[in-house]
């Protein structure tokens, strides 16, 4: 698929193997010097992203001051981010291959790639296109939208990430509430700045965002989640004093007025908003989408190539689904129509009630426990990968993704959290849940992330810069495939259909994302095409299309990454023959850490050249 890189990857693999054959020349003073510089970069990054410090459990000791801060949301912070990337790349250029070990070269190359993403975003002086955004969720042309912005992210962050075990922790939480008001105003200034450049979200994105903000403002400050969360945390920690009352006072005096100002700024754009869904209408929109696609996939694939990939894989997967449906007596109508009918079968429907939602949460926990004993079929690695299962908070469920994972802390103080959007149980026929769960938990995101937190083998900068979308989401989609390969669907034909439907969904995403942004598809056209091909509920598919509009390119990383991991596996198997061990291959991909696909190709090629013996 990514054939244009083959020659480069082979040469790079030879270079890596050359390093392994000369151990006396590597792993010494030059490695130590690089490690020191990477640590400097890590500390600078954390000062720019104190929220990352908290999420990773690093806001302690010498970094405790970071616990009182939120990320700076002003345009000045964007300029700081880009200067950091430029300076970091200049510093890394002082560390050529000579004298560096394989692992050191890998650390350097991954860090340089990440910094290059931030540097290359400079021509697009709107939206939120920075190193921090690329490593966090996704770059976006709209500073505030239905899924990105301080109003949506900070309440969830404070509730799930900010730990309160002492009075100092509670005071830090209160400091962050003051910061939240400043962050909202910083975003509002950028909204107006971008509007002056002709950057206004599509009308449906604007309406959804304003609707969510209106819902938040309708909640009394005393009942706001970021207020009650502090009260709960302080009570659980046995802290004296009324921290909740102090939080309410900040909400009333600072946060609600700032959110009201932001909603007014967005509302003022309503008359200018258009129904055009794609970024092609933005300044340098076509170039922006090429950058976004590169950032999301870590390849040089063009929109047309990605679109064709999606169409081809959609057809192939549909053929597999058709055979299973026919084998089980479902022969009439398109695959999408038959899957829609199966989704309405009472055997697979959860009640759309609080009790039904709890049934889903219980079922997900059971799936996680059932897959753990079978992981030894796919890995030699022994990881714990603890996971909590929670529903997406009600106050953000209208714009939130259908399912996602918050990674655990590096120090193990907080497990990964698997969130599922239970706005309606209609979106979750039972057969769709196993593959989603393997994707988000084990052997997917939680497993891959656990290698970082449980082994401590990667330097801090690599643990921080771990948001390479195509690797992270490609691995999680590959994990769904591993669920099939280790037998999780052997007695569950509907579950296997759900798995294939999920694979088909990701192929369809390639078509939709490129259709919206490169081929000028409308929102309605995209939703209808998705319904015709997937047979899933309109509500869920509309939410997905809106997501692709706000995060261009991001949804393409899943299938591009999954396809590349399989290409590398097939290539290694063909080269090694009987020496190929799929468990060792899977371990290698995890042990590489989150990396761009170009770098992953170098690692796998070097491993193959070593006869499958190289270790990281």
Model regions and ranges:
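N-terminal maturation segment of proteins
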Residues: 23-616
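N-terminal secretory signal peptides and thylakoid transit peptides that target proteins
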Residues: 1-15
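C-terminal segment of classical bacterial N-terminal signal peptides
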Residues: 17-23
């Amino acid at each position: 698929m990514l054939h244009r890189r083959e020659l480069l990857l082979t040469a790079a693999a030879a270079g890596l193997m050359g390093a392994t054959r000369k151990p006396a020349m590597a792993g010494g003073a030059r490695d130590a010097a690089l490690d020191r510089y990477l640590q400097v970069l890590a500390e600078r990054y954390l000062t720019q992203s104190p929220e990352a410090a908290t999420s990773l459990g690093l806001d302690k000791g010498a970094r405790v001051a970071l616990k009182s801060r939120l990320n700076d949301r002003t345009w000045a912070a964007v300029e700081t981010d880009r200067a950091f990337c430029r300076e970091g790349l200049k510093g890394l250029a002082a560390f050529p291959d000579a004298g560096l070990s394989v692992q050191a070269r890998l650390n350097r190359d991954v860090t340089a790639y990440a910094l290059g993403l931030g540097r290359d975003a400079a021509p697009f002086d709107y939206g939120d296109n920075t190193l921090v955004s690329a490593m966090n969720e996704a770059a976006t042309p709209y500073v505030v939208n239905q899924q990105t912005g301080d109003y949506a992210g900070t309440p969830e962050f404070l509730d799930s990430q900010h730990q309160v075990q002492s009075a100092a922790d509670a005071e830090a939480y209160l400091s962050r509430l003051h910061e939240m008001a400043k962050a909202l105003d910083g975003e509002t200034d950028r909204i107006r700045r971008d509007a002056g450049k002709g950057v206004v979200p599509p009308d449906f994105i604007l309406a959804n965002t304003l609707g969510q903000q209106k819902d938040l403002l309708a909640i009394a400050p005393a009942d706001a989640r970021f207020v009650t969360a502090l009260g709960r945390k302080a009570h659980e920690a046995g802290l004296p004093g009324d921290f909740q009352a102090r939080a309410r006072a900040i909400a009333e005096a600072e946060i609600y007025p700032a959110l009201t100002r932001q909603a007014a700024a967005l509302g003022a754009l309503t008359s200018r908003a258009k129904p055009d869904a794609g970024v092609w209408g933005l300044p340098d929109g076509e170039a922006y989408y090429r950058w976004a696609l590169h950032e999301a996939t870590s390849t040089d694939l063009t929109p047309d190539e990605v679109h064709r990939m999606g169409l081809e894989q959609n057809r192939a997967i549909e053929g597999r689904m058709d055979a299973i449906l026919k084998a089980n007596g479902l022969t009439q109508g398109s695959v999408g129509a038959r899957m829609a009918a199966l989704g309405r079968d009472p055997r697979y429907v959860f009640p759309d009630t609080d009790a039904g939602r709890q049934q889903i949460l219980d079922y997900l926990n059971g799936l996680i426990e059932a897959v753990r004993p079978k992981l030894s079929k796919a890995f030699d690695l022994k990881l714990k990968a603890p996971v909590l299962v929670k529903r997406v908070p009600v106050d953000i469920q209208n714009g939130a993704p259908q399912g996602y994972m918050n990674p655990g802390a590096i120090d193990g103080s907080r497990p990964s959290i698997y969130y599922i959007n239970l706005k309606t149980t209609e979106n979750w026929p039972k057969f769709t849940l196993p593959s989603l769960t393997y994707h988000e938990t084990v052997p997917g995101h939680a497993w891959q992330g656990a290698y970082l937190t449980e082994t401590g083998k990667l330097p801090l900068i690599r643990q921080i810069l771990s948001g390479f979308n195509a690797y992270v989401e490609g691995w999680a989609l590959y994990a769904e495939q591993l669920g099939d390969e280790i037998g999780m669907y052997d007695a569950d034909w509907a579950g296997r259909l759900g798995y294939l439907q999920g694979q088909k969904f990701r192929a369809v995403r390639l078509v939709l994302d490129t259709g919206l942004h490169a081929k000028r598809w409308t929102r309605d056209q995209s939703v209808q095409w998705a319904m015709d091909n997937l047979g899933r509920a309109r509500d869920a598919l509309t939410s997905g299309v809106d997501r692709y509009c706000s995060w261009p390119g991001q949804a393409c990383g899943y299938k591009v990454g999954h396809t590349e991991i399989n290409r590398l596996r097939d290539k290694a198997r063909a080269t090694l023959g009987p020496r190929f061990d799929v468990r060792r291959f899977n371990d290698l991909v995890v042990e590489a850490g989150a990396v761009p696909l170009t770098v992953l190709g170098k690692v796998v090629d070097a491993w193959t050249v070593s006869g499958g013996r190289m270790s990281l």
